[in-house]
Design a protein with these regions (language model features):
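S-adenosyl-L-methionine
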Residues: 44-87
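Active-site segment flanking the S-adenosylmethionine/decSAM binding pocket
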Residues: 72-118
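C-terminal substrate-binding/active-site "lid" region of AdoMet-derived donor-dependent transferases
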Residues: 106-165
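Glycine-rich helix-loop-beta junction characteristic of Rossmann-like nucleotide cofactor-binding loops
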Residues: 8-14, 34, 109
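Short beta-strand element of Class I
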Residues: 38-42
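Conserved class I S-adenosyl-L-methionine
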Residues: 15-24
Length: 172
């Protein structure tokens, strides 16, 4: 739902290398490749079912087998997966796993100078991690909120989705 806002912030980064942590369906990484044809993505997703969605979405996005080397996937947990990356990132997206020990620190250390890190949190625990992180490296917070129309009897009501706290930081 908040893919556009996240991609907009990520695409402000120079270069073409993205780490997508907690990649889920792979949408952020695949859209990154669409916007950066020379780019590459290292997607980290420990849940097998979600990695299956990623493969289906890669085909749907038209990412052929000859291009799959630009979209590599690790089934390990972050930050343990970081050592398997073939490149240092110009941009990092954290869509899940914020409360894992060392995740933000490791991603920030790996991030190239001038690079952008975007982290989205929907839980209070994730938001607490981002609040503490912001005290260390600054950056900007945005709360993203969307409501959708749905039937309420014969009328239409508006139901809010879970809001997302987004933190964006650029590494000096």
């Amino acid at each position: 739902v908040y893919k556009r806002q996240s991609l907009s912030a990520l695409l402000a980064a120079p270069g073409g290398g993205l780490w997508d942590i907690g990649a889920g369906s792979g949408a952020i990484g695949l859209e990154w490749l669409r916007a950066r044809p020379e780019g590459q993505v290292f997607a980290i997703e420990p849940h097998g079912e979600r990695r299956g969605f990623m493969d289906k979405n890669a085909r749907r996005f038209g990412l052929g087998h000859d291009e799959r080397d630009r979209f590599t996937v690790s089934g390990a947990h972050a930050p343990d997966a970081f050592d398997a990356a073939a490149f240092s990132p110009d941009a990092v997206f954290v869509g899940g796993g914020l409360s894992r020990e060392g995740l933000l620190e490791g991603a920030w250390q790996a991030l190239n100078s001038g690079g952008v890190l975007v982290a989205n949190a929907v839980t209070l625990e994730g938001q607490a991690v981002l609040s503490t992180w912001r005290e260390r490296v600054h950056g900007d917070f945005t709360t993203l909120s969307v409501s959708r129309g749905e039937a309420v009897g014969r009328f239409t009501g508006v139901r809010p989705l879970i809001p997302v706290l987004q933190w964006v930081g650029r590494k000096p």
